[in-house]
A protein has these predicted regions:
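Hydrophobic helix-coil surface modules that form long, contiguous segments used
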Residues: 158-314
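A surface-exposed beta-strand-loop module
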Residues: 83-140, 190
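Surface-exposed beta-strand/loop patches in extracellular or lumenal glycoproteins
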Residues: 65-86, 157, 163-172
């Protein structure tokens, strides 16, 4: 009995020591459940102000800046996610003061020297990761599902930490861009275009999205809603299908509003029909991405293809 009691006590001590996390301990690779819970509990009022400078040549680097504002319940290190080459983090400021950069296991660890209880601002200059930018010769689009926002910019990449995103894109003058929120302003300067978007409603990082490049546009308004379709297709037979595509999007929205009694919760519903998109669609609020082959059908589509398109549009719309 004494022997059993000894082992029970020993096991309890081992578990207690294992649970102790000494201050300054390196974070694990990825987002552990412990880190996710701690951040969700201690951080609130989260906002990202993001700016990307996108060159026309896809071989050139995309330069980024993020200003993260947050409220912290107590002064402790802030662990951000950034799954990229550590050398791509160029500068760190905390509450306006330059701070040393500490990278550990795909995380940027912001120390407590300049953090304070309550409101804080963390500013990072960085080179954007290419993994989730999907860069082509004349366009690019982000796809951050399920946990790839951290491959693009420093963030808290867990879905329960929703944030307001305010985005600026510096792009070639002849390009257009679409994002989760509506355009607030456009400024031209020396062959470049700076597009500022309105703040989004609170979003998870995997739903943040933007598309830029050479795109054609068609718009349709019904029942007080205007939807814009962005596409690169040049076949007139396929482009002419925009009428039925708009019909199905508006029908899906109306059916869902009638069925749930809830108005569409976002400021806009634009759709981007992407050549070779990896999935059938992706429900980014305000900028839904669709696969071109699923949306633009051939001259003699089967019933299955037509129903498949209708089901896809209804499916992505239901997500929102």
């Amino acid at each position: 009995m004494k022997k059993q009691l000894f082992f029970i006590i020993l096991l309890g001590v081992v578990e207690l020591l294992a649970g102790c996390r000494p201050e300054g301990k390196e974070p694990e690779t990825g987002v552990s459940i412990g880190l996710a819970r701690q951040r969700k509990q201690d951080i609130s009022n989260l906002q990202y102000r993001l700016k990307f400078r996108i060159p026309e040549n896809k071989q050139e680097e995309v330069i980024g800046k993020v200003q993260i504002t947050l409220k912290q319940e107590k002064v402790q290190p802030v662990v951000l996610d950034f799954r990229e080459d550590p050398h791509k983090v160029k500068q760190l400021k905390v509450n306006g003061r330059p701070d040393s950069i500490r990278i550990s296991n795909e995380h940027i660890v912001v120390g407590t020297d300049y953090l304070k209880k309550g409101a804080n601002e963390i500013e990072i200059d960085f080179i954007a990761g290419n993994q989730s930018l999907n860069r082509n010769d004349e366009f690019l689009y982000t796809l951050l599902v399920p946990e790839r926002a951290r491959t693009l910019f420093p963030c808290f990449d867990q879905p329960d930490m929703k944030a307001v995103f305010t985005l600026q894109l510096d792009i070639p003058e002849q390009w257009v861009a679409v994002a989760n929120a509506a355009v607030e302003s456009e400024t031209l300067h020396e062959g470049r275009k700076l597009i500022a978007f309105q703040p989004t409603q609170p979003l998870s990082t995997y739903l943040f999205s933007f598309v830029a490049g050479k795109w054609q546009q068609l718009a349709e308004s019904r029942d007080g809603k205007t939807i814009v379709m962005y596409y690169r297709e040049t076949d007139p037979q396929k482009v002419a299908q925009h009428t039925i595509i708009f019909d199905q999007v508006f029908a899906s929205l109306k059916w869902l509003e009638d069925y749930t009694g809830i108005p569409y919760p976002f400021d806009k519903y634009d759709l981007v029909i992407v050549p070779g998109f990896q999935f059938g669609g992706m429900e980014h609020p305000g900028a839904v991405l669709y696969n071109d082959k699923r949306m633009f059908l051939g001259p003699h589509p089967t019933i299955e293809e037509e129903l498949g398109r209708m089901e896809l549009i209804a499916h992505e719309t239901t997500h929102m």
